[in-house]
Amino acid sequence: DMGCGTSILAILARMRGAKPCTAIDIDEWCVRNSIENIELNGVTDIAVSQGDASALQGKGPFDVVIANINRNILLNDMKQYVACMHPGSELFMSGFYIDDIPAIRREAEKHGLTFVHHQEKNRWAAVKFVL
């Protein structure tokens, strides 16, 4: 869960059977809040780290990567997401506008990702790719 914020996505993934899970955020408050939320929800096997996408180095491979961050960070960090994935891994990204999908898609395809689909709500977009 990149840009985990409160770690709600990592917590949900863990509750649905994913394990182990990793949650990373650049903000110290988010890391502290994530740890608290994980404890409040009674889940285990979620490792929380403070940092940017470089914190992924040496981790994985992951079956699923979730990133809910702005467009520019997603474009910049996508190479690092792919580096911790394996063939068949899924990448879900959100936090950008529907108009940004072509740029996100071009960058993803440069890194060997295949576009699966997108969803839109109030001009906000979420996309799914597979490696």
Protein language model regions, located:
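A short glycine-rich, Lys/Arg-flanked "PGG" loop and its adjoining helix->strand segment in the class I
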Residues: 75-90
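Hydrophobic beta-strand segment of the Class I
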Residues: 64-66
